Amino acid sequence: MKIAIIGSGISGLYAAWRLSEQHQVTVYEKNNYFGGHTDTHELEIEGTKVAVDSGFIVFNDYNYPLFTDMLKKLGVETQSSDMSFSVNNLVSGLQYNPSKKWSLFARPQNFLNRKFLQMLSDLLRFYDDNKDIDVADIDPNLSIEEYLDLHKYSHEFRYEHLYPMCGALWSAPVEQVGQIPYRFVVSFFQHHRMLQLKERPQWQTVKHGSASYIRAIQKKCRSIEWKFAEVKAVSRSPETVLIETVEGQSQYDWVIFA
């Protein structure tokens, strides 16, 4: 069958990779590059070329089983990545790294810091209260700030840990993090095993930049037709699908919006 895939993010690329084994596939992309969120830049540092990712950066086999399997089958190299989190608050003077037990108390003065110990206490309470909660039972309109107020979480836990972490995860100003839905935060933390102290997933990154897997798909799946073209319209008949671009119309059996 002739199949059109509109969009070349990971969903479109994965579909193209699998379907091209048995079908004639065409991928449409309105941008001037394939890969969607994947954005690898090649920089030269002291005479050495270095691939730097500014879009898609990390993955793990627990949350991304199909993606991990695809990389293995394509022969794309990966390596372990450090997804640690640390805080250096220039206003309060608090510094800590909770990634390891020894790094958490690397600064002896934190042992005697009442606010730091309060933050740790609330952190453990937040983990314990939310790791097994059914997200479906959470009010979708309840913000994380409202939840923290309701359960009397400290200012230190919010501004020295939870808010900075959420801000780093979603590129959001710390001042606005409190408005994020509590349900969304808990769902994300549960899904990525961030509410447990043990058995957290080992994060991985693609060697030579995430764009490596795009090149691998294009090399392996030479039958795929790649088009830099914005789709203007899609129309259906009982038997076919018409894709319209500035170049004209093309006919397919199926279309996938990715």
Predicted segment positions?
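N-terminal glycine-rich dinucleotide-binding loop that anchors FAD/FMN and/or NAD(P) in oxidoreductases
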Residues: 41-67
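Helical element adjacent to the flavin cofactor pocket in flavoenzyme catalytic cores
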Residues: 187-238
